[in-house]
Amino acid sequence: MQLYHFTDPRNLESIRLFGLMSWQQLIQQDIGHFPGSDKDSRRIDARKCLGNYVHLCLRPEHSMAELAVKQKRIESFVWLSIDCSVISLETTQFSDQNATARAAIINHDPQTALASKNPRAEVLVEGSIDLRWISFPSEVQPGILVKNDSINIVDPITF
């Protein structure tokens, strides 16, 4: 099993240097980045004490990725594949839907996300994700995830 995180390809250089960091850590360490989230999402994250968590998807598809491109927060996106070992980290949290949703159930039980039928269920990893758990696309092309020799193409024209 893999988990996924979308990002603007322009962020890949800093991710390769520092790992995948929460937006709060990026700001605290003054690391330039192109966020996929908007100000409202970050405000809700902060209110729910989730600003220091990296949000991961259960599948390489998420309406927020498409919306971020449509709203021009990012130019395009690539999917990073994250080893599921992060699930067992003591501080990892799980949400049955997008963690910023009012009705979201967020706790430390992996089944909260893994058993959820909601395609926006999330795994929330505190702080940052070490490089050893991140698989990068073999070629940096917008909207492409290379996994197990198969290519999943997200057509940016549809955004």
Pin down the residues of each PLM region.
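Active-site-proximal loop/hinge segments that shape catalytic or ion-binding/gating pockets
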Residues: M1-F159
